[in-house]
């Protein structure tokens, strides 16, 4: 297993245990801050470093659940060569895919702390994905697209879902795991993939 907490502690230049502890509580601070930023979500995602900590914990939990092993297995099984990581956060899904030889396009909010950290991680792991920003429009086909924990943050996710459907056969997404409560007020929309995709396995969906 990759020690994601160790990487973040190295990046922040802070104590490992302190960094790990902040990862466990970052979601509370994010929920608290939302009231200030709810009318300007882009600023929310751009300015706070809390998402680095929250996403590190999230990816660590996926790693513990063997989801990363499954993700790389699916890449190998299907022989995918090029993928898109929408709202790629700390870059873990991009790194995992590129470890298996996939060419990746990574998208995140320009000048955000998550993008800054992801770029540091890409360099640390010796990979060079194509990095684009939040205004990126999907205009080419991909073997697969990753949209884990992304669409619920969009005010209107339907155009993005339609673009994904047009440009890939395979989608990684987790709508059945999403929560809508006081702890995640930044989840501002609900969506239904079933008109466009069929659920295949765990987080994997196939275009209808």
Residue ranges and their predicted role:
Residues 1-138, 178-208:
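Conserved N-terminal segment of class I S-adenosyl-L-methionine
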Residues 81, 143, 169:
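Conserved acidic residues
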Residues 146:
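A conserved beta-strand element that flanks and buttresses the S-adenosyl-L-methionine
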Residues 150:
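Hydrophobic adenine-recognition pocket in adenosine-nucleotide-binding enzymes
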Residues 154-163:
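A short, conserved alpha-helix within the catalytic core of class I
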Residues 168-179:
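Conserved beta-strand signature within the Rossmann-like core of class I S-adenosyl-L-methionine
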């Amino acid at each position: 297993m990759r020690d994601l907490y160790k990487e973040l502690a190295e990046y922040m230049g802070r104590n490992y245990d302190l960094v790990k502890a902040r990862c466990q509580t970052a979601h509370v601070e994010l929920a608290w801050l939302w009231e200030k930023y709810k009318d300007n979500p882009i600023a929310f995602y751009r300015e706070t470093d809390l998402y680095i900590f929250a996403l590190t914990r999230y990816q660590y939990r996926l790693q513990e659940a063997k989801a990363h092993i499954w993700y790389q297995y699916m890449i190998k099984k299907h022989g995918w060569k090029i993928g898109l990581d929408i709202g790629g956060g700390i870059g873990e899904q991009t790194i995992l895919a590129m470890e298996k030889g996939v060419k990746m396009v990574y998208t995140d909010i320009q000048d955000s702390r998550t993008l800054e950290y992801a770029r540091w991680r890409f360099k640390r792991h010796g990979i060079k994905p194509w990095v684009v920003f939040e205004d990126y429009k999907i205009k080419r086909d991909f073997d697969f697209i990753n949209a884990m924990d992304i669409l619920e943050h969009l005010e209107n996710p339907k155009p993005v879902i339609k673009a994904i459907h047009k440009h890939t056969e395979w989608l990684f997404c987790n709508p059945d795991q999403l929560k809508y409560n006081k702890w995640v007020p930044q989840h501002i929309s609900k969506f239904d993939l079933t008109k466009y995709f069929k659920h295949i396995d765990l987080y994997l969906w196939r275009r209808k």
